[in-house]
């Protein structure tokens, strides 16, 4: 849309690795590279967990970085829990002129909360007041 309207802005899109099971994502990836959308940055929350199961029990999406590069994207990988790395990676976009950028942020779902960490069971679970308080306590928050 920006190119057609001759507007100069940068678009950021965030997806989870579980979403990348959908073919429309890969169609969009091919089109973005084909049209040289250097004003597009994709952030992938790569936590290895989809809504219904761990990614490896479904259709594997790894190796993500290699796939995005094969589609013509400039790629960086970071620790998605390191705020400094996140800021540095976002400040550096576009990674290559004339190519869309993919930032793969490796994370652990529910990090720091024992009953939610690294499990799909808390992907869309109900958070009661008690659960909320327990999570805050485990994170060391008041």
What are these regions (language model features)?
Residues 1-142:
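Glycine-rich ThDP/TPP pyrophosphate-binding loop and its adjacent helix/strand module
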């Amino acid at each position: 849309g920006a190119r057609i309207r001759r507007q100069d802005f940068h678009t950021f899109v965030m997806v989870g690795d579980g979403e990348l099971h959908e073919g429309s994502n890969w169609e969009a990836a091919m089109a973005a590279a084909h049209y040289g959308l250097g004003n597009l940055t994709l952030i992938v929350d790569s936590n290895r967990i989809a809504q219904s199961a761990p990614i490896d029990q479904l259709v594997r999406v790894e190796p993500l970085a290699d796939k995005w590069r094969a589609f013509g994207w400039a790629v960086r990988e970071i620790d998605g829990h390191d705020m400094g790395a996140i800021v540095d990676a976002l400040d550096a976009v576009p990674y290559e002129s004339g190519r869309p950028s993919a930032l793969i942020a490796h994370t652990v779902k529910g990090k720091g909360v024992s009953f939610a960490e690294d499990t799909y069971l808390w992907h869309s679970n109900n958070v009661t007041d008690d659960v909320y308080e327990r999570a805050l306590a485990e994170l060391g928050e008041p």
